[in-house]
């Protein structure tokens, strides 16, 4: 993850944004659904979340190396007068611990003589509950937005909750914990309880982990009291200024609270 506010972080984010605008103007605009770090950073503000990843799910298209190569080539060929050039470097299947099978696209971007690597992970068949939403993505350097399809908030949170519950103390991605805290802080009042409940169960069903949900309370206890997890969180706090004031118990309280909310099925 890049350090928030650093030149590299801003440049990375800008290049991802340039790719998103090309998607929004391409024939594939209704097939690409944004998720992951770039979406969370957009939701909470770049000063509150670092990102190095652009994750998307694709619907209505095959996710294999050849088809994705054609799709990406078409997107980066969209003519935009922003001085940014994209070059495809490699496309490969994702095999590392992926919740969903997918394709990893590696590109380089060139802007004003500076070359920046850009990585995009593309999956298909994600459980989006109830469905993707139109997201108004604010541009960094211009006073306008682009409309793209994206995960809804409940599905973003459900995926992170499911990961925390099923990976227990083997989940070294502290950003999953931070994201739950910050998204709840900033957008918790907009959450639909029933949708969150349904999204968590749909995600677990898709990943074949439904049996783990019943163990959530024990998992949270184990994770909160784990010295390994506490050390990982302390390291994250030192690295990222936006998390510096957040104690581990505050983070875990947010995780427990979100899970409790998902457990309460609406009576409506």
Regions found by a protein language model. Name each.
Residues 1, 20-24:
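Short amphipathic alpha-helical segments enriched in leucine
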Residues 1-5, 9-10:
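Single conserved hydrophobic/aromatic residue that forms the stacking wall/gate
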Residues 2, 50, 99-101:
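Residue-level preference for beta-strand/loop junctions
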Residues 7, 17-21, 31, 61, ...:
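Catalytic cores of NTP-dependent nucleotidyl/adenyl transfer enzymes across multiple folds
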Residues 10, 37, 152:
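Extended interaction regions within the primary functional domain
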Residues 24-54, 58-60:
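Active-site nucleotide-donor binding segment shared across nucleotidyl transfer reactions
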Residues 39-45, 201-212:
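Short, mixed-charge aromatic SLiMs
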